[in-house]
């Protein structure tokens, strides 16, 4: 007897329209298993002595489905989408591009990344500037407050409008409290003060603030650092996450800061500068901010490079610095000529070098 094996695939959809389930039917047909009661060629169906009695063959069987189901793996539930981060209390909409910069001291932006800032103002961009230290130079909070006033007045000069500024104390999702200032007539401009202690030219700080510094915090030598006005101490993680939060909250598409530690142009710069550049780099990298939208300002070493500013841009840069310096008793200069004549400051004013 020759058995013929027939295999047919069965495909179906689940009631939910999910993936197809596949099984197989196996059937067997006996080709010689069909007989008649009349025998063959008129020969009687009654058995004779010379032939053995025939055993009736069973009728051909119908295909019987194989009811054994092929094991099917349980569907794997997709991973849930991560919850979106909470909206920052510092969330600030802007209808144009946003230039954010992060600096150590209250004049670093005016000296080392201008006229880039002037160009941002001229283009109608939103400008958000963050200062990490109180720029107190060990001289106390009164001196620091004067420098803050100088910065706000310099920004009035750069934006081409005079007016009062309003302060908003904001506690970020990171837990860090910031002092956020904007002109009453222009929310597109924001200046943020964190007021951490000035680290001094040698990075060792000042007796007045207990010799605690931002470079020590960034290096891990210090667990936390308190603002000079008595706020809650910040850890390095809190500072980094705060900057990341502000980059997102401000919808930044252009970021400026100091040259980070360990890079070619960090040598010879103020330790607060390179520490600020380092923590800012960690902040933008943590959120995947595009590296090609970040520029690092060369600091003190610009004085050794060729002067590259002149004409109207230089005049406007010097004018903004002059307005600031009127509130800074250390670098005060009453005219453009006097500012340009100041050792080191005059050289920095005539230069701007940015690295990527």
Where are the regions a protein language model picked out?
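The feature marks non-catalytic terminal segments
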Residues: 229, 250, 254, 269, ...
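N-terminal export and membrane-targeting signals
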Residues: 1-9
């Amino acid at each position: 007897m020759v058995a013929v094996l027939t295999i047919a695939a069965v495909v179906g959809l689940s009631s939910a329209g999910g993936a197809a389930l596949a099984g197989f039917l196996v059937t067997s047909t006996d080709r010689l298993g069909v007989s008649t009661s009349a025998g063959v060629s008129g020969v009687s169906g009654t058995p004779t002595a010379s032939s053995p009695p025939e055993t009736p063959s069973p009728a051909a069987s119908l295909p019987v489905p194989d009811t054994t189901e092929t094991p099917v793996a349980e569907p794997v539930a997709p991973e849930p989408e991560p919850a979106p981060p909470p909206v920052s209390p510092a969330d600030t909409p802007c209808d144009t591009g946003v230039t954010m910069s992060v600096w150590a001291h209250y004049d670093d932006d005016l000296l080392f990344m201008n006229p880039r800032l002037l160009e941002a103002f001229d283009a109608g961009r939103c400008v958000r500037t963050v200062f990490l230290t109180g720029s107190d130079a060990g001289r106390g909070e009164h001196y620091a407050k004067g420098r803050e006033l100088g910065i706000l007045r310099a920004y009035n000069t750069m934006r081409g409008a005079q007016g009062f500024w309003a302060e908003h104390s904001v506690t970020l999702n990171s837990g860090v409290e910031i002092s956020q200032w904007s002109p009453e007539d222009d929310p597109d401009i924001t200046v943020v003060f964190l007021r951490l202690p000035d680290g001094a030219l040698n990075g060792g700080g000042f007796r007045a603030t207990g010799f605690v510094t931002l470079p020590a915090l960034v290096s891990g030598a210090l667990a936390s650092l308190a603002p000079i006005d008595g706020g809650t101490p910040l850890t390095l993680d809190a500072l980094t996450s705060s900057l990341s939060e502000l980059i997102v909250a401000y919808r930044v598409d252009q970021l400026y800061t100091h040259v980070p530690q360990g890079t070619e142009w960090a040598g010879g710069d103020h330790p607060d500068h390179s520490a600020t550049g380092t923590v800012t780099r960690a902040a933008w990298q943590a959120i995947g901010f595009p590296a090609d939208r970040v520029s690092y300002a060369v600091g003190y070493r610009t004085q050794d490079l060729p002067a590259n500013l002149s004409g109207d841009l230089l005049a406007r840069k010097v004018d903004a610095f002059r307005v600031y310096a009127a509130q800074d008793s250390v670098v005060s200069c009453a005219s453009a000529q006097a500012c340009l004549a100041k050792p080191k400051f005059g050289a920095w004013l005539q230069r701007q070098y940015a690295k990527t």
